[in-house]
Amino acid sequence: MRRDEYFEKLLEVIEELKIEAEEKPIIVEGKRDVESLEKLGVEGTFIIIAKTPIYLIADELVRKRVKEVILLTDFDRRGRMLAKAIIEEFRHRGIKVNTKIRHEIFIYTNSGIRDIESLFSYVNKRLF
């Protein structure tokens, strides 16, 4: 796939995220991740996990009867470790974890970003 094809695919993934976010909360690491996603037009419920234990977030989601979340942790070592811990805890509690969008963002940015907060600037630079 050529670079421009990857970028077109990335834009499609962002559109998919906008639709999915209408019904499913998005798990992110920090408020800058939220700001980046909002600048891209993603609206919805964001859950910032920076300083909250994962089991407490899972408790709250179970209490609210949330069945599925979208996982958008960063692509660095810490983000991968967080993703693994979240998947394990949430699935144990019966909460489906959508990792597809996170995976596709990583692929279609050609590993060009290390974190979700960089996604807006990555897209913006290529559009203008």
Swiss-Prot record:
PROSITE patterns found in the cross-reference section: TOPRIM (PS50880)
Domain named Toprim: residues: 23-105
Keywords: Magnesium, Metal-binding
Entries under Gene3D superfamilies matching the protein: 3.40.1360.10
Binding residue positions for Mg(2+) 2: D74, D76
Record has Magnesium as a keyword: yes
GO molecular function, one term: metal ion binding
Textual note on the cofactor: Binds two Mg(2+) per subunit.
Cofactor entry: Mg(2+)
Sites where the protein binds Mg(2+) 1: E29, D74
Organism superkingdom: Archaea
Transmembrane spans: none
PANTHER family xref list: UPF0292 PROTEIN MJ1624 (PTHR39964:SF2), UPF0292 PROTEIN TK1411 (PTHR39964)
Family indicated by similarity: Belongs to the UPF0292 family.
Protein name: UPF0292 protein MJ1624
